[in-house]
Regions:
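Short, Lys/Arg-enriched anionic-surface-contact patches
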Residues: 18-27
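Secondary-structure edge/capping motif, primarily at the C-terminal ends of alpha-helices
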Residues: 88-91, 119-126, 154-158, 185-189
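Amphipathic alpha-helical packing segments from all-alpha helical-bundle domains
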Residues: 131-157, 165-183, 200-212
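Short, basic, alpha-helical segments at the C-terminal edge of helix-turn-helix-like DNA-binding modules
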Residues: 78-84
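N-terminal positioning helix adjacent to the helix-turn-helix/winged-helix DNA-binding module
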Residues: 26-33, 170
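Hydrophobic alpha-helical connector segments
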Residues: 75, 89-117, 134
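C-terminal peripheral helix-coil segments that are non-catalytic and often amphipathic
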Residues: 4-18, 183, 187-247
Length: 247
């Protein structure tokens, strides 16, 4: 129930959820196509002329709504930030069910994937658009806070005995993995960036960071994680298990 509430809450923020592309206002169509092109081609490789051509409008018409690519990137980032802020502040509460935590992480990864151009080369885009540097860093801290909250919950119910310093290190590792997962996979070049399995592989990778801290529950935890991964994806991650797991 918590997961579906989160999905509805997130969807409610988005614009034009039930509106077809043809019904969108020109400004919203520009934003939609810009995001599509940035994700597909990479933001540095797309010009405002490319966007206008894709929309079959004049560059002047595009300029009427956005005075340049900088304004477009800022608008897209603001939308990304607003929605991600809600997601990161609403982690699954009071639930130890693997499915709940799995689908919460799926929502996190799916939202990042929808704006993956921001993550393709983080340092470059922050250098090019200084106005998003501070809020982007804030999001990274929020990822750490969300991860820390989940780890503290596990300790509170006695699943793990990890101390505060260990929780801080684990939360940082989780935030690091989430932030650079798409970039890492893109560098491997083994599959198209839109592959859904990429998201489930990312979730499994994050959960594998938590498993070593669960003591006797480690094997059961990862067995459940692998079972969910096999059910929802195509098991693209090598089926290696943590030490002590089944052969």
């Amino acid at each position: 129930a918590a997961f579906f509430f989160l999905v509805m809450l997130t969807a409610g923020i988005g614009n034009n959820i039930l509106v077809t592309f043809g019904q969108m206002k020109t400004r919203d169509r520009i934003i939609h196509v810009s995001l599509e092109l940035f994700n597909r081609e990479g933001e540095p490789n797309v010009t405002t002329v490319d966007i206008a051509n894709e929309l079959e409008i004049s560059p002047g018409n595009l300029y009427y709504h956005f005075k340049g690519k900088e304004e477009l990137v800022r608008e897209l980032f603001e939308r990304f930030y607003e929605q991600f802020n809600v997601i990161l502040r609403a982690p699954v509460q009071n639930s130890l069910r693997m499915e709940d935590n799995w689908f919460y992480l799926v929502v996190v990864f799916e939202h990042m994937h929808a704006y993956r151009f921001l993550y393709r080369n983080i340092s470059l885009i922050l250098q090019r658009y200084e106005q998003i540097q501070r809020p982007f860093r804030r999001l990274i801290h929020m990822k750490q806070d969300a991860a820390r909250a989940i780890c503290v919950q596990l300790r509170t119910v006695g699943v793990t005995q990890i101390d505060d310093a260990g929780i801080d290190m684990l939360a940082r590792s989780i935030a690091l993995t989430i932030t650079y997962w798409f970039n890492f996979d893109h560098l491997l070049g083994d599959r198209p960036s839109q592959d859904e399995d990429l998201i489930h592989d990312g979730v499994l990778q994050v959960l594998s960071l938590i498993a070593p801290h669960l003591g006797a529950m480690q094997r059961e935890f990862m067995d459940t994680a692998f079972a969910i991964h096999s059910r929802l994806g195509r098991a693209t991650v090598p089926a290696t298990r943590p030490r002590g797991g089944r052969k």
